[in-house]
Regions:
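Short, non-transmembrane amphipathic alpha-helical segments
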Residues: 61-83
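Short secondary-structure junctions
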Residues: 17-24, 78-83
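N-terminal presequence-like segments and adjacent domain-start helices
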Residues: 1-21
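A generic structural signal for short, solvent-exposed coil/turn residues
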Residues: 15, 36, 45, 79-81
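Short beta-strand-to-loop capping motifs
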Residues: 55-59
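Short edge beta-strands and adjacent turn/loop segments
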Residues: 24-54, 86-98
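Short linear motifs at secondary-structure transitions and domain/linker junctions
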Residues: 18-21, 27-34, 61-65
């Protein structure tokens, strides 16, 4: 079974490899991160019962947000050791030439 920091690293890599993800999110009220010793993985919170993956998605969206989240969950859940995997979309990254 992977350590929390190994799982956080793997979840971050999986999320960033997902179409539509611009970057890892920072969380809303507190920083979303997993720590072990001097190492920090931003955007992933590994708890005893769940893994939270915080992301910033690109606009325009290549597909609906629930599909992007589903792809992240499909990549992370098999590595999560039975923990519930949740995706939080913290923000949208809008290109300078895009209108909302």
């Amino acid at each position: 079974l992977a350590t929390d920091i190994q799982l956080a690293r793997a979840a971050s890599v999986a999320a960033l490899a997902t179409e539509g993800v611009h970057a890892m999110g920072r969380g809303r009220y507190v920083e979303a991160a997993t720590y072990e010793g001097p190492e920090k993985v931003s955007g992933v919170v590994v708890g005893p019962d769940e893994v939270e993956v915080h992301v910033v998605v690109r606009w325009p969206l290549p597909r609906p947000i629930p599909e992007i989240a589903g792809s992240i969950i499909a990549r992370v859940a098999p590595q999560a050791g039975g923990r519930k995997t949740m995706v939080m979309v913290d923000d949208l990254e809008v290109g300078a030439d895009e209108d909302l």
